[in-house]
Amino acid sequence: MKTKLNELLEFPTPFTYKVMGQALPELVDQVVEVVQRHAPGDYSPSVKPSSKGNYHSVSITINATHIEQVETLYEELGNIDIVRMVL
C-alpha cells in the first residue's frame, strides 16, 4: 500500500528541499529565486560540495502551507537547467 505525501503531512509545516546541481555560483541564487516565487521569506540555504567538487547540494527549508506548493516547487526546482536532482 502506497502512502501519499499529503497523507503524511499536516499543513502548515516546515519542509526541506535538497537540490543537487552543477557547482556554479548561480545555483544558490536560482534555487532561492524559485522558492521566493512560491514561499516568500528570508532564506539562508546551506551548501555542500561533492567530494570531487563538480556538484553542490543546496538545502533550503520553507514553511509549506499546502501540498500543491510542495509539488510545484519540486517541479520548478527540477526545471532549473543546472539542477540534476531534487529530493
From Swiss-Prot:
Name of this protein: UPF0250 protein KPN78578_06520
NCBIfam families referenced in this protein's UniProt entry, alphabetically: PRK04998.1
Family: Belongs to the UPF0250 family.
An example Gene Ontology CC term for this record: cytosol
InterPro entries, per the entry: UPF0250_YbeD-like, YbeD-like_sf
Top-level taxonomic group: Bacteria
PANTHER family: UPF0250 PROTEIN YBED (PTHR38036:SF1)
